[in-house]
């Protein structure tokens, strides 16, 4: 059934594909001879190309950040609450670019793509990627679109790490960095969660060493468990308690190990089932490794202020009080380093019950603070 699109929507959008035939050297020592990036754009690029904003996605994100692909779509893009006319990233002012990162599974070249050298899917042979690899590939997309400098680069979670990396790798190509619910590197606990998720996939009998496509199967159980573990870390204890508590699906206990008895069990299984049907297992492994490897200050003995000494962008750092995956303390590490390096930075810590997922949820103070900063950006 067709729906009437909201007035503050960017409307119907069509994904585009950019192909690059110049080899891309990667941090792992390998290279990709050619690759494709799928992206969407919203709004119009002005004559001086000074109003461009790049959206960097998180672990399971993709290029479809706003609008609709068809009037029959049940939901808009994943960040539609923040991108559109009159929204924080106002498409009446900005030309917005959102892409599916290299290694993804939504159209950009990744493990599920055909390796031209073999005629088969890359699978586990796809090279391991880093955040800086993504930034280099994104810079090539900017060149292709005629964008010399971004007015702003915006991202939440892993997307925020990409935004931060941009300001270090290409300091003269970024005027503003909006880094939301992120961190300067993962804690040991976060790496541990990622490893549990990876082991769920790697030990699934249907994984076949990453060559499951050749076998005509998917490691559904492993992906499901990985998503269930990950999803717990995206929510706060308060929000889970309020949403589910100890409510049962029926009015009695079954006294077995197979029934789905609690509402929270049902929710996690649904999330896992849905995710396992749309996401690639090898991509999940790649994304979590890129998270683990992100540590830009390592080259300076862990001194983040020294690492940021050469940056020229202005920064807006936002965090959420109940986010325990990337707590406010992690955002303040970035803020403190920027201040020590004498850079321009503003910081907003937002009261929210929604945990790490709060960066996706349009609460009033978040939207107001986000919009206030974006409206200050000269174009």
Curated annotation (Swiss-Prot):
Residues at the site labelled Important for acyl-CoA specificity: 325
Record: residues binding substrate: 227, 357
AB hydrolase-1 domain mapped to chain residues: 51-360
GO molecular function per UniProt: homoserine O-acetyltransferase activity; homoserine O-succinyltransferase activity
Compartments, record wording: Cytoplasm
Active-site residues annotated for this sequence: 157, 323, 356
GO terms under cellular component: cytoplasm
Keyword Lyase: no
Catalytic activity, EC: 2.3.1.46
Assembly behavior: Homodimer.
Family: Belongs to the AB hydrolase superfamily. MetX family.
Name of the molecule in the record: Homoserine O-succinyltransferase
Organism: Pseudomonas putida (strain W619)
Lineage: Bacteria, Pseudomonadati, Pseudomonadota, Gammaproteobacteria, Pseudomonadales
Name of the gene encoding the protein in the UniProt record: metXS
